[in-house]
C-alpha cells in the first residue's frame, strides 16, 4: 500500500515499475515473499526474478546420469487447484522424464496429493500412502533397460 500511495503521489503508474528479486526468494519456506510478490503484481507492479541459471540445481541436473531424482517435500503440497504451481511441477516431472530419471515425490500424506501425482503419471513417492517396500535388486533402473535395448 505504501508503494502504491507513493506512486500515486508522484504520478508514476505501477505498471512502469519493475522490482528485481534475487532467486534466493525461491528457497523461502514461510510464504511471506511469495505473498508480497503476489500483492505487488495485483497492484500492477512487475516482478523479475534474476540470476536464474548458473547456480540453479535444475539446470545442473543434466550433468548427472541419475536413475532417480527425489524432489523436495514442497512438491507434495502443490494443490491441483493451484494452476501455476502445478504447471511448474509438471515441467519438473517432464524434465526428469526427458533425462530418463524417475522422479520421486516425498512426504505424500493424503489421498488428494496421491490423486494429483497419479494424474501427472508420477509412479514413485514416499510417505504414509506410499505402499510396500521393494528390495533394490528387484528394481531395474530405466537407464539400464535403455542400454540393453540400444545394444
What role is predicted for each listed range?
Residues 1-13, 38-39:
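Bacterial c-di-GMP phosphodiesterase EAL domain
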Residues 33-36, 57:
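Short beta-alpha junctions and helix-cap segments that line functional grooves
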Residues 1-5, 33-34, 89-90:
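Well-ordered, non-membrane alpha-helical segments in soluble/globular domains
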Residues 8-11, 41, 62, 97:
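Residue-level signal for alpha-helix termini/capping positions
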Residues 16-29, 45-151:
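EAL-family c-di-GMP phosphodiesterase catalytic domain
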Amino acid at each position: 500500500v505504501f508503494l502504491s500511495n507513493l506512486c500515486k503521489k508522484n504520478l508514476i503508474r505501477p505498471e512502469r515499475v519493475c522490482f528485481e528479486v534475487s532467486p534466493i526468494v525461491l528457497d523461502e519456506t514461510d510464504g511471506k515473499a511469495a505473498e508480497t510478490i503476489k500483492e505487488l503484481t495485483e497492484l500492477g507492479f512487475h516482478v523479475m526474478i534474476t540470476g536464474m541459471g548458473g547456480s540453479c540445481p535444475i539446470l545442473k541436473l543434466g550433468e548427472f546420469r541419475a536413475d532417480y531424482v527425489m524432489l523436495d517435500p514442497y512438491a507434495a503440497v502443490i494443490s491441483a487447484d493451484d494452476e501455476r504451481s502445478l504447471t511448474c511441477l509438471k515441467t519438473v516431472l517432464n524434465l526428469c522424464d526427458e533425462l530418463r530419471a524417475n522422479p520421486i515425490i516425498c512426504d505424500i500424506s493424503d489421498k488428494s496429493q496421491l490423486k494429483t501425482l497419479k494424474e501427472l503419471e508420477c509412479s514413485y513417492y514416499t510417505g504414509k500412502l506410499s505402499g510396500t517396500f521393494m528390495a533394490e535388486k528387484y528394481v531395474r533402473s530405466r537407464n539400464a533397460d535403455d542400454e540393453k535395448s540400444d545394444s
